[in-house]
Amino acid sequence: MTGKKSSREKRRKRSSQEAAAALAAPDIVPALASGSSGSTSGCGSAGGCGSVSCCGNANFSGSVTGGGSGGSCWGGSSVERSERRKRRSTDSSSVSGSLQQETKYILPTLEKELFLAEHSDLEEGGLDLTVSLKPVSFYISDKKEMLQQCFCIIGEKKLQKMLPDVLKNCSIEEIKKLCQEQLELLSEKKILKILEGDNGMDSDMEEEADDGSKMGSDLVSQQDICIDSASSVRENKQPEGLELKQGKGEDSDVLSINADAYDSDIEGPCNEEAAAPEAPENTVQSEAGQIDDLEKDIEKSVNEILGLAESSPNEPKAATLAVPPPEDVQPSAQQLELLELEMRARAIKALMKAGDIKKPA
């Protein structure tokens, strides 16, 4: 009887344990889900279930513990990834910061170099210290060399910036040729003034003023020569003309003969005209006290006129033979004025002829 009771009690205990295990089984499933999500609390409850392995569910409980360990590994990998991301972000930020600092230092230096390259007067090759430096005016006798030195001073880059829009497409050789043509037209004096900084218009005005003063002095000298020659001719030949005017009808022929003689005398060498002494201009003398002198001059002039008429075949002989002996009649004021005008006209005509002869020579 005791044996049967003990077996019954054992069976009851087993059934109660199985019922307790069956009741605990639905609690293990949410524990696995919580363990797979990485929560350590689910893993701990699964570990508690592992203590019930005495009922033969050891394998199941072992799987529960494994799920807990898997959750812990998943959580650790996510932490490592987040740390790696943080490291990458810090590395990228440090690299970008260093690049920004480098650009801050590099860009100003590049800008300075470009600015200096654009605005500097230095050209390729630099300055040759072996060649002695001389001013541009030193080469004024050789205009071609002076132009070459000017182009070396300015340089090709700066010249291209200085050129107007019309000459932008021209080459350096064409520009040099144009400059050479313009330079040949300028005098050395004007080039020196331009190099000294004087205005070109001022130099042109000065040159025109110099030319005008020269022309004015030439005109004044010609007028002086004309006046001197007219006065000398008038003083020397006036008495003869006065007495010839007193003739009856042949006065014009006599005056024409005298005019040819005066022209031949005036057209002589210029040196003789310059060397001729300037006689005082006392052309009008008193009428009463000069009658005897007039008679002598009349006789002399008549003889000269007769000699000229015989020597010139073109003149008619009747003109010289028809001159009557002069009478003692004083010339009128109108005759004197006409004679003076005629003498001046002859002197001007002779000077014009002399100037025409000098020009071809």
From Swiss-Prot:
Which positions does the record annotate as the modified residue Phosphoserine? S89, S120, S203, S312
| Keyword set includes Cytoplasm | no
List residues, modification Phosphothreonine. T90
Sequence ranges of Basic residues compositional bias: 1-14
Looking up InterPro entries in the UniProt record yields: CAAP1
Expressed, tissue-wise, as follows: Ubiquitous.
List compositional bias (Basic and acidic residues) regions by residue number: 234-251
Instruction: Mention one GO biological process in which this protein takes part, according to its record.
Output: negative regulation of apoptotic process
Q: Which UniProt keywords apply?
A: Apoptosis, Coiled coil, Isopeptide bond, Phosphoprotein, Ubl conjugation
Could you list the residue ranges forming a coiled coil in this record?
A: 281-311
Q: Where is composition skewed (Acidic residues) in this entry? A: 199-210
**Chain intervals with Low complexity compositional bias:** 19-28, 272-281
Does the record bear Oxidoreductase in its keywords?
Answer: no
Annotated spans, Disordered? 1-28, 67-100, 198-218, 230-331
**Cross-link position per record: Glycyl lysine isopeptide (Lys-Gly) (interchain with G-Cter in SUMO2):** K104
Superkingdom, natural source? Eukaryota
- Physiological role: Anti-apoptotic protein that modulates a caspase-10 dependent mitochondrial caspase-3/9 feedback amplification loop.
State what protein this is by name. Caspase activity and apoptosis inhibitor 1
Designated gene of the protein: CAAP1
